[in-house]
Amino acid sequence: GMGTKKRRGFGRCRVTEWQVWTFDLRQDQERTAWLMFDHTVRDFSAPQSSIVQALGLTLEQTDCRDRLCINATFTLDSPLLIRSGQDEIGLAPDVIHLKSRRAGENAPVPILSGTSLTGVMWHRAERILNTLGQPTAMLKQIFGFVDENKLAEPARASRLVVHEGVIAGKTHDLVQNRVAIDRFTGGAYHGALFSEQPVFGTHETTINVELELRNPKDGEIGLLLLLLKDLWTGDLPVGGGRSIGRGRLQGQQATITQYQRKQSSPQTWTITQGNTLVVSDAESRE
């Protein structure tokens, strides 16, 4: 990824075409040729789809980093609303669901942002640790942190990568008109009518959630599985309007893969939701 918030789904990109020119900077003529080279000319080198082929190298295909990957598919059990900015033309409800452009799509598609998902997971993880009487220092190790004073403790990058999830399949964008409540009288607040446009799911709507925990420890894996369980059962809503029933998901299928340096092949567990919940090889994870 490029830029900031790479571990929250931002900055992901893909190079579709590579061209490589080689200069030996130890030679005077080569250094001059590099300085005078016209980068706009594309005829000297044939384009390649892979940087490995373009450089003429061979790389190990196996990623040996220790990490736990969770790929889960959910459906919308209730409307979902993650606030975004106003529409470009200004003819939109007061609050609309967040959308993003994707390659191959003619129009922006609704998404589940990595920042929104991370926020609810962080707060639920803190509640779980407090309930169990465990120190919350683990949260800093997993989610990272920045000390506002920048003196007490150095900042730490998040080891949990949360990707943006595209809300795929057919959805309905319906506008709901609401009125603000006067907290003093309990009645309608004068002149506070507003409209919202959440995403309503259908039986075809799915959301794919991708999580990756790098250098995981057993306790951190257990905490992440508890968060997955709460998302799966709809006990952990995401987005706004949770107090009026929005943002609840229903788990359908999940694949948990653990990569370890000491093992030649990764371990994989699957979770499926039918009439009963089925977890493959659950004993080994325990």
Question: What residues fall within each predicted segment?
Answer:
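Small/polar/charged residue-enriched interaction surfaces, especially the RNA/DNA-contacting tracks
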Residues: 1-286
